[in-house]
C-alpha cells in the first residue's frame, strides 16, 4: 500500500451575512484534497493529514469527521494554546464571494514549532509521497517555511516523491518577490507539479503555456500537470516537445468551483499512486472535479462522489 502525507491547514468556515444566520463548516485546499483522495482511493492508499489544531471542541469535531472520511489524523498535532483559523464567506447581490480571514494565530501556522513535530519529521521520511501547496508554505513564518523546505530536501534524498500545487494567493505573501523566491526553492525539489494557468500568469507573468512549461523544466520538475479550467489540462514529462492535452467533459450546470482544483488533484494523485497512466489519472481527476463543481461548498456530500466508479478502466 502506498502512503501519502498531505501538509496544510484546515480552517473553520462561516458562510452568511454578519449578525444573521450563518452556516458553519470547515475547509482548506490541502484538507479538501485529502478528503477527496480518501474517497477516491478507498483502502488502496493510506492518507496522512499533517497539520495542527487546538484542543477545543471544534478541533475535536473536525478530527472526528476526518477520521470518518478515512484520513489518518495521527499527525495532526494538538496545540493547547491555539485554535483553528477562521474565514468568513460573504456573497454580494451578484453572487460574487468575498473572504475575511482570521488565521495569523492559528495552530497550523506554528506547526513546525510544536514540540511534537520531530515525530512528524521522522514519519515524513518513511512515506512514498509528500503533497503540499503554495498555501501550505505561505501561512508559515519565514523561518519555519525555510525549515520545511530543508526538511523536504532531506526526505527527497531518501526517495520520497514531492508533489506541489502552486496555489498562489497574493494576500498571503508580503511581496510577489518573496513568493517567487520560495517557489523557486520548492520547485527544484518537485517531482510532480500541479499548477494552474491563472496562478502562473499572476505570479510569474507567463503569457503562454510554453512559458510555464519551459520555466518548470528549467527548475528540474519531472512531471507537470497544467490545469486549464474547462479546457482540461496538459501533461508532460518532457520526453517529447509537445504536451498531451487531456480534455474534460463540459459541465452544463456549474454551482461552485471552490474545490475544482483540489478535487482534480485528489483524483489525479489517487491514480498516479496506484500506477495508472497520466492520462487515466487526469481523466479520473476530471471526473471527480466535474461532480464536485455541481454542488455547493468545498466538501460535497459523500453520496455525490460515490456515484463515480474509480475501480473500472477509464477510456
Predicted regions span which residues?
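Substrate-binding N-lobe of the ribokinase-like
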Residues: 18-96, 104-108, 314
Amino acid at each position: 500500500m502506498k502512503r501519502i502525507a498531505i501538509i496544510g491547514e484546515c480552517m473553520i468556515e462561516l458562510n452568511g451575512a454578519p449578525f444573521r444566520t450563518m452556516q458553519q463548516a470547515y475547509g482548506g485546499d490541502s484538507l479538501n484534497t485529502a478528503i477527496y483522495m480518501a474517497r477516491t482511493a478507498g483502502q488502496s492508499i493510506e492518507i496522512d493529514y499533517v497539520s495542527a489544531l487546538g484542543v477545543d471542541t471544534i478541533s475535536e469535531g473536525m478530527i472526528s469527521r476526518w477520521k470518518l472520511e478515512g484520513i489518518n489524523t495521527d499527525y495532526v498535532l494538538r496545540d493547547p494554546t491555539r485554535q483553528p483559523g477562521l474565514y468568513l464567506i460573504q456573497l454580494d447581490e451578484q453572487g460574487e464571494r468575498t473572504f475575511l480571514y482570521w488565521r495569523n494565530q492559528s495552530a497550523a501556522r506554528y506547526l513546525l514549532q510544536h514540540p511534537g513535530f520531530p515525530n512528524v519529521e521522522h514519519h515524513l521520511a518513511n512515506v512514498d509521497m509528500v503533497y503540499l501547496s503554495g498555501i501550505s508554505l505561505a501561512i508559515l513564518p519565514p523561518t519555519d517555511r525555510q525549515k520545511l523546505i530543508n526538511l523536504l530536501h532531506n526526505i527527497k534524498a531518501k526517495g520520497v516523491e514531492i508533489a506541489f500545487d502552486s496555489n498562489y494567493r497574493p494576500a498571503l505573501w508580503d511581496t510577489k518577490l518573496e513568493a517567487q523566491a520560495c517557489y523557486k526553492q520548492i520547485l527544484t525539489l518537485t517531482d510532480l507539479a500541479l499548477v494552474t494557468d491563472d496562478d502562473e500568469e499572476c505570479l510569474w507573468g507567463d503569457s503562454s503555456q510554453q512559458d510555464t512549461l519551459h520555466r518548470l523544466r528549467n527548475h528540474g520538475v519531472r512531471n507537470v500537470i497544467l490545469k486549464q479550467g474547462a479546457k482540461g489540462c496538459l501533461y508532460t514529462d518532457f520526453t517529447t516537445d509537445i504536451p498531451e492535452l487531456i480534455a474534460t467533459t463540459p459541465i452544463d450546470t456549474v454551482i461552485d468551483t471552490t474545490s475544482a482544483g483540489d478535487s482534480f488533484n485528489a483524483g489525479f494523485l489517487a491514480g498516479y499512486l496506484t500506477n495508472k497512466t497520466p492520462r487515466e489519472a487526469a481523466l479520473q481527476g476530471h471526473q471527480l472535479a466535474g461532480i464536485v463543481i455541481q454542488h455547493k461548498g468545498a466538501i460535497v456530500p459523500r453520496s455525490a462522489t460515490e456515484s463515480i466508479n474509480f475501480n473500472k478502466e477509464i477510456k
